[in-house]
Amino acid sequence: MSLVVRKRSGDVEPFDHAKLAAGIARAASARLESDTVDAVSAELAEALGMRGAEVTSEEVGVAVLERLRELDPIAYLRFSSVYKGFEDLADFEREVDELQRDLAQRDLGGSLQKTTEPKGPRN
């Protein structure tokens, strides 16, 4: 049985692995190696297929967001801006703030330390 995707409109179409890979590649342009993009898209396709014969486009988008968030914050923001339909800078600011909080919690403050280190040459 092949995987199908239920779109927001209610239409159902076959899952397109190439479309998934292309979306990830666009978001990760110059950020992730093509082998990594291929591996991520294959991993997500397999995980989505394990959910059953049908997934929603929202499930696909959220899966991509979650994986990119783990891999590369810039690729995540690029994908998020399109997927969530950012309309202004405030949308980006909110997303960056949330991402920084999450990264700081995950790193136990690692990303915050970078901003508090002294700037300039060390003696």
What kind of feature is each model-predicted range?
Residues 1-123:
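Long, C-terminal-biased catalytic regions of enzyme "large/alpha" subunits
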